[in-house]
Structure formats: structure tokens, C-alpha cells
Amino acid sequence: CLKDENGHLFDRFRGRVIFPFFSVSGKVTGFAGRLIKQSDKAGKYVNSPTSILYEKKHELYGFYQAKQAIKREDCCYLVEGQLDVIQLVQSGIENVVASGGTALTYPQIRLIHRFTENVTILYDGDNAGIKAALRGLDMMLEEGVNVRVVLLPEGEDPDSFARKHDATEVLEYIKQHQTDFIRFKTK
């Protein structure tokens, strides 16, 4: 709970869709809440406060559900948001996790690296996504991860793209448009 200006308690997640975060062993550790209606007063996302169980920099949305597919496919698709994960999984792509925005962290990279050395960054094609992909590339290379980047068509994010295409089409697009870190950084 939080307090408003008048000292009244209210639920920090009110008016939001709630996404649970799970530990590697499947226990709920925290939540992210996304606004249902856009507001100038409130941030788009709110996370659980940092605790013994939950620290945002260590969390990857969907990791518990994706870890076996990541191991089986020997590849992890890294997206920005929870809705990106949900839509890609619904389209049939299971080896996908979200960093929870564009702020990828070393603990998140190390968690992925425990299950695969191969990561494909599939961030939004906007300026923020491109900048985040560049930062993420350097961090992953420092951690010894083989990293590739896919930029989606302008105006698309993984959620919207997967709504328009089935898994075969999404995977074909990734195959045709993925680029290694050298080519991506020199574009």
C-alpha cells in the first residue's frame, strides 16, 4: 500500500494489469503493474518494492516459464516488456523473456547465460530500443554471450508484430533480419 496526499492508504497496483515475476524455482517473488488507461500523473509501469525476494535488476519476466525452451532451443529472445513475451508465447515462441524495459542488467544477462550462450535482442525499433540494444550488446559481450540483434519494422514492437504473424513467420523474419554485433554497431 501507498499513502496519497491526504494520508489515505491505496493499493500501489490499482488501475493496472498485474504481471507476476517468478524465481527460477517457480515461486512468486514480485509484481509489475501496467496502467490500463494512460495518465499524465502516473508512470506506465509500477514494480513491487525491493525486498529479500524481489529486486528488479535480477528479474526477467517469463524466465521461469521459458527456461526449458531456452535450454532446448539453445537460444533466448530478449524483449522489452511483458506484453511482448505474452504475445510471442501465444504465437508459439516459448524461449522469450523480458528485461522489463530498456534497462538490461548484468544479473539478468548472467541468469540467461546459465541456460544458453546465444541471445537475440528483439527490442522495439524506436530510438530508445536501438540505444538499449547497443548498450545491451556491449554488456552481453563482456559476459561472453553470443548476441544478435533484430530490428522490427518501424512502428512495430514484438507484441504488435506477433499479433499480425504466426510463429513461423516471426521466426523467418528473425532469421532474415538478425545481425551480429559488428554489423549492428556499424549501421
Q: Language-model segments: what does each one mean?
A:
Residues 111, 138-145:
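Arginine/glycine-rich "motif VI" loop of SF2 helicases in the C-terminal RecA-like domain
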Residues 115-123, 167-173:
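Short, structured secondary-structure boundary patches
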Residues 83, 104, 123-133, 151, ...:
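Acidic, metal-coordinating catalytic cores used for nucleic-acid/nucleotide bond scission
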Residues 1-115, 119, 133:
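Phosphate-handling DNA/RNA-contact segment within nucleic-acid enzymes
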Residues 60, 106-109, 113, 129-134, ...:
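Amphipathic alpha-helical transducer elements in NTP-driven molecular machines
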Residues 144-187:
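C-terminal or mid-to-C-terminal helical accessory/interaction module adjacent to the motor/catalytic core
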Residues 92-96, 136-139, 164-167:
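Short secondary-structure boundary/capping segments
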